[in-house]
């Protein structure tokens, strides 16, 4: 019996294109001014110090820091300082109504159905927890945060490492064999399965993917009895 579902975002609840073509460029365009305007803010300086530690570089100015973060965006780095600062920038975009977060049409109805059945719902994404809350709070299906019991990001650990899922299981405090992890990335599902999770690969493009895991083209086709 499935007691909790943990879902990825990109390629799972939502289109990768929205993140790549809307959110990433929005943050990239605003990074230099954001850092210049908020350079002395403690929350920003905390991330600058973390970025210095991760990169081995000294980031003594907003311009130098912006150059590093823009390079990380180009490299699609899953660095926690980058994700945290992106979340701060995206917050303004959501609140200003510059965009709403994309959700596949089946996502919100399925989340609501599962929630009504008493299944606890969680998110595990490489985006920061702040960014995740904004994503589901300002979605094109409305505010979905009331359906979610919690969020996990890279501070828990990399998504392709089994220990990350063990930490999630401990935090949720339910047996691993009652947890279901949803993702479009095979290696993430492999790591979750190694931790004892049930898994399902989302094939949103209906590409006929072959997998060691159960495959579903959308949330309506996910079999909770597996």
Curated annotation (Swiss-Prot):
Respond yes or no to whether keyword Nucleotide-binding is given for this record: no
Cite the InterPro entries for this sequence: Enolase-ppase_E1, HAD-like_sf, HAD-SF_hydro_IA, HAD_sf
Q: Which GO terms describe its biological process?
A: L-methionine salvage from methylthioadenosine
The protein's Enzyme Commission number: 3.1.3.77
Q: In which pathway does it act?
A: Amino-acid biosynthesis; L-methionine biosynthesis via salvage pathway; L-methionine from S-methyl-5-thio-alpha-D-ribose 1-phosphate: step 3/6; Amino-acid biosynthesis; L-methionine biosynthesis via salvage pathway; L-methionine from S-methyl-5-thio-alpha-D-ribose 1-phosphate: step 4/6
Required co-factor(s) are: Mg(2+)
- Which stretches are transmembrane? none
Indicate what this protein is called per its UniProt record: Enolase-phosphatase E1
Which domain of life does this protein belong to?
A: Bacteria
Q: Listed GO molecular functions?
A: 2,3-diketo-5-methylthiopentyl-1-phosphate enolase activity; 2-hydroxy-3-keto-5-methylthiopentenyl-1-phosphate phosphatase activity; acireductone synthase activity; magnesium ion binding
Q: Which UniProt keywords apply?
A: Amino-acid biosynthesis, Hydrolase, Magnesium, Metal-binding, Methionine biosynthesis
**Would the keyword Metal-binding turn up in this protein's UniProt record?**
yes
- Cite the Pfam families for this sequence: Hydrolase
- Which protein family is named in the record? Belongs to the HAD-like hydrolase superfamily. MasA/MtnC family.
Oligomer and partners: Monomer.
Q: How is the cofactor bound?
A: Binds 1 Mg(2+) ion per subunit.
Record's catalysed reaction(s): 5-methylsulfanyl-2,3-dioxopentyl phosphate + H2O = 1,2-dihydroxy-5-(methylsulfanyl)pent-1-en-3-one + phosphate
Q: SUPFAM superfamilies this protein is in? A: HAD-like
State its role: Bifunctional enzyme that catalyzes the enolization of 2,3-diketo-5-methylthiopentyl-1-phosphate (DK-MTP-1-P) into the intermediate 2-hydroxy-3-keto-5-methylthiopentenyl-1-phosphate (HK-MTPenyl-1-P), which is then dephosphorylated to form the acireductone 1,2-dihydroxy-3-keto-5-methylthiopentene (DHK-MTPene).
């Amino acid at each position: 019996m499935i007691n909790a579902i943990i879902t990825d975002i990109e390629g799972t609840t939502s289109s990768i294109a929205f993140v790549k073509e809307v959110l990433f460029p929005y943050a990239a365009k605003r990074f230099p001014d954001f850092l210049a305007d908020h350079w002395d803010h403690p929350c920003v300086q905390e991330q600058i110090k973390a970025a210095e530690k991760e990169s081995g570089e000294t980031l003594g100015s907003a311009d130098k820091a912006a150059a590093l973060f823009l390079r990380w965006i180009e490299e699609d780095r899953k660095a926690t300082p980058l994700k945290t600062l992106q979340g701060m920038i995206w917050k303004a975009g959501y609140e200003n109504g510059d965009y709403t977060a994309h959700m596949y049409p089946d996502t919100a109805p399925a989340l609501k159905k599962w929630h009504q059945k008493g299944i606890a719902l969680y998110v595990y994404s490489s985006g920061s927890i702040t960014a995740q809350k904004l994503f589901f709070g300002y979605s094109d299906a409305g505010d979905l945060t009331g359906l979610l019991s919690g969020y996990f990001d890279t501070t828990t650990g990399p998504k392709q490492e089994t220990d990350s899922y063990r930490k999630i299981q401990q935090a949720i405090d339910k047996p691993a064999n009652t947890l279901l992890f949803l993702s479009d990335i095979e290696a993430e599902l492999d790591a979750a399965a190694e931790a004892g999770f049930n898994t399902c690969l989302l094939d949103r493009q209906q590409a006929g993917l072959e997998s060691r895991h159960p495959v579903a083209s959308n949330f309506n086709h996910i079999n909770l009895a597996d």
